[in-house]
Amino acid sequence: MAQIFNFSSGPAMLPAEVLKQAQQELRDWNGLGTSVMEVSHRGKEFIQVAEEAEKDFRDLLNVPSNYKVLFCHGGGRGQFAAVPLNILGDKTTADYVDAGYWAASAIKEAKKYCTPNVFDAKVTVDGLRAVKPMREWQLSDNAAYMHYCPNETIDGIAIDETPDFGKDVVVAADFSSTILSRPIDVSRYGVIYAGAQKNIGPAGLTIVIVREDLLGKANIACPSILDYSILNDNDSMFNTPPTFAWYLSGLVFKWLKANGGVAAMDKINQQKAELLYGVIDNSDFYRNDVAKANRSRMNVPFQLADSALDKLFLEESFAAGLHALKGHRVVGGMRASIYNAMPLEGVKALTDFMVEFERRHG
C-alpha cells in the first residue's frame, strides 16, 4: 500500500510506530490474553499505564512539582466551561483575549458563568492578519484570570510569546493544537489544557495542567467530572476514564521521549513549517494571508489563486496519498495540519505535489 499522509486538523495523524505497537498488542496486551480496552481502569495493570503516562508527560514538559496533571473527558470545549467553573472563585469577571475562532468559542461559553472582559487582539498589518503583541493586551484589575489560545487551528494564527504579566495574573491557555510541539514554561501559567486529538493521541482524552493553589475553588454547580479537585483527589478516575485513549497517549509520550523529546520536535516542526511556507511564499499560485510573526507551525492554511481549481487540487492530492487538505468551512481554501506525527517526508511530498500542480495549472 502506498504511503498515506494525513493532514487532518484532528483527529490527526498518529506516529506509525505507535499504531504498529497498538496493533500488535490489541488482542493480547501484556500477555493477559485480553485487550487493554477490556481491563479494569482500577486494576494494577492499567494503574501502571496511567502512572507511566503522567510521569512521561511531566518529563516531556518539565512540569513543576506544584502542578497537578489531570486526564479528563470533555475535550477543549469542556474546558471552556471547566476553567471559569474552577478558578473564578468569588470573582465575577475574567480577561479573555480574542485572536481567532477557538478563543471566541471559549468566550461564548464563559459568558454562561462570568462576565468576560474581552480584548480583541486581532489586527491587519499590510493586508495580512496578525495579533497584537502581549505588551499591548489590555487586562483588567479585578479579573480572576486571563485566558487565551496560543494556536488557532482554523485561522492558522499562533501566539508564540511567553506570558509575562506578573505573578498576580493567573494565565489559562488552550494548548490543544500546539502542546508538545515546542517547549513551554509551565510556571508562567495557572492552567494549561489540551484536547488529545492533535498532538497527544486519539480523541476522547483531555489533559489539564493546573497549579495546585488553584484547586478547591470550584463553583458549587460545577459538574463533578469537570471539578479539578475531585479529579485530582481521585487520580483522574472519579468515573471510568477513556482508557484506550489514555493508553495510546502513553505510547505517544514514549515515542516522543525516544525521538529526542519536545526539543527535537521543536526543531523538526520548524523545518516542516519553513519548507511549506517557503513554497507558498515563492509562488504567485498559492497564498497565505497571515503575518509571518503569527504564522502557525501546526496548521498552515493556504488558498489557490484560482479557487475554481480547489476541487481538482483536493482530488489529485488525495489520489497522491495526501489526505484531509480541505480548509475549514469558515475560511475555505486548503489547510495542512503538520503536527508532531507528520514526518518531514510528508511535508516534502506535499510541497512536491504543490510545485507540480502549479506547473500544470499555473
Swiss-Prot record:
Pyridoxal 5'-phosphate binds at G76, R77, W102, T153, D174, Q197, N239, T240. Pathway: Amino-acid biosynthesis; L-serine biosynthesis; L-serine from 3-phospho-D-glycerate: step 2/3; Cofactor biosynthesis; pyridoxine 5'-phosphate biosynthesis; pyridoxine 5'-phosphate from D-erythrose 4-phosphate: step 3/5. The keyword Transferase applies. Binds 1 pyridoxal phosphate per subunit. PROSITE patterns: AA_TRANSFER_CLASS_5. GO terms for biological process: L-serine biosynthetic process; pyridoxine biosynthetic process. It is an enzyme of class 2 (transferase). The keyword Metal-binding does not apply. CDD domains: PSAT_like. Its main location: cytoplasm. GO terms for molecular function: O-phospho-L-serine:2-oxoglutarate aminotransferase activity; pyridoxal phosphate binding. One of its GO terms (cellular component) is cytoplasm. InterPro entries: Aminotrans_V_dom (IPR000192), Aminotrans_V_PyrdxlP_BS (IPR020578), Pser_aminoTfrase (IPR022278), PyrdxlP-dep_Trfase (IPR015424), PyrdxlP-dep_Trfase_major (IPR015421), PyrdxlP-dep_Trfase_small (IPR015422). It comes from the Bacteria. Pfam families: Aminotran_5. Belongs to the class-V pyridoxal-phosphate-dependent aminotransferase family. SerC subfamily. This is Phosphoserine aminotransferase. The gene is serC.
